Amino acid sequence: MRPLSEKVAGIAPSATIEISNRAKKMQREGIDVISLSIGEPDFDTPKHITNACIDALNRGETHYAPSNGIPELLSAISDKITKENKFPCTPGQVIVTCGAKDAIYEGMEAVINPGDEVLLLTPAWVSYEPCVQMAGGKIVKHAVNQNTFQLDDSILERVNARTKMIVINSPSNPSGAVFDKKSMKLVADLCQDFDLYAMSDEIYEKMVYGKEHISLAGIGDMAERTITINGFSKAYAMTGWRLGYAVAPAAIIKEMSKVQQHSVSQATTFAMWGAVEALNGDQRCVEEMRAEFDRRRKFVISELNLMGYKTAPADGAFYAFVKVAGDDMAIATKWLEEGHVAATPGSAFYAPGWIRLSYATSMDRLKEALQRIKRVGGN
């Protein structure tokens, strides 16, 4: 038979999903594995959101909807962006997608031409590079400062005539770092000075602890060249709903819409009604989940530091990024096989020598996991 696609063959499987699947296999074999490897809140979706979805099903909201999203959700998103993220947004600048990952992929397809370079700040989430590759682009990596996890002027050395876009993620997966005003202004100045597009992944914006979340598009005229990525999975514990969105200039949204129309068509109609309630309804659930994540964060970071591990500034998201002595892949494997704790090696995020732990699980399980890590060792 003829060979399959070389483009897809060159893309590595998701390391985070691979580790999670391995842990689940051990669990099916009867082994008590504590999984700290996947970025998913352990809370159920709040009832007022699920009830809105059930109501939509009961009234027959089971048909095709506009490809970019139902008008009610587009309006709710544009209102939220204007009010909370502090840059003007109209419904015509929004597209609702099948998860934030889909928004990232569509955004890359809309902007990137074959041979274009995309500047990626590392450590970085595993799926940005494959999305760039599928769009025909090439990733150029730039490591943030390994002590502060902020940016400095050395990033200028990575820009050339082929650079088309920069991707940022604040709060960061995997490090939990939140970019400060200086770092964000540096990105904005870089884009304006070199005429670059920006993709700002802000999916963890509600999980910030004692810091300020800054939207890149709210700086100067950056809204004219920024694709802001967000969704409902993290803030509202709606991972399985597969609902994300992008906010961008109307010309970019038009191109993203073409990709969506000829692939997934639209996000699920009745699920979008749940998202309307998520944005327009009671927001106390978001703060309650954030407060619980903060409680776990303080405990996990404190315990790891007491064991002698260095950790990245955990000011956002729900991850502890841990510096280990030696091969992170080998240590993560040791933790899994000997301690039955699943964690993700930093090499998956272009950060060898680090390991990511998710504290999106119960306090009892976190306490047990840390005891196992302490027993097995690795620092």
Please place each PLM-identified region on the residue numbering.
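PLP-dependent class I/II
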Residues: R2-L4, A12-S14, I19-R22, M26-V33, ...
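Glycine-rich phosphate-binding segment of PLP-dependent enzymes
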Residues: T45-Y64, S78, K83
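Generic beta-strand or strand-like secondary-structure segments
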Residues: A52, A56, E72, A76-K80, ...
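Acidic/polar N-terminal loop/beta-strand segments that form early-domain functional surfaces
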Residues: I38-P41, S67
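Substrate/cofactor-recognition hotspot
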Residues: V8
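Conserved N-terminal alpha-helix of the aminotransferase class I/II PLP-enzyme fold
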Residues: Y64-T97
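Glycine-/proline-rich flexible loop or hinge segments
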Residues: D32-G39, A56-G60
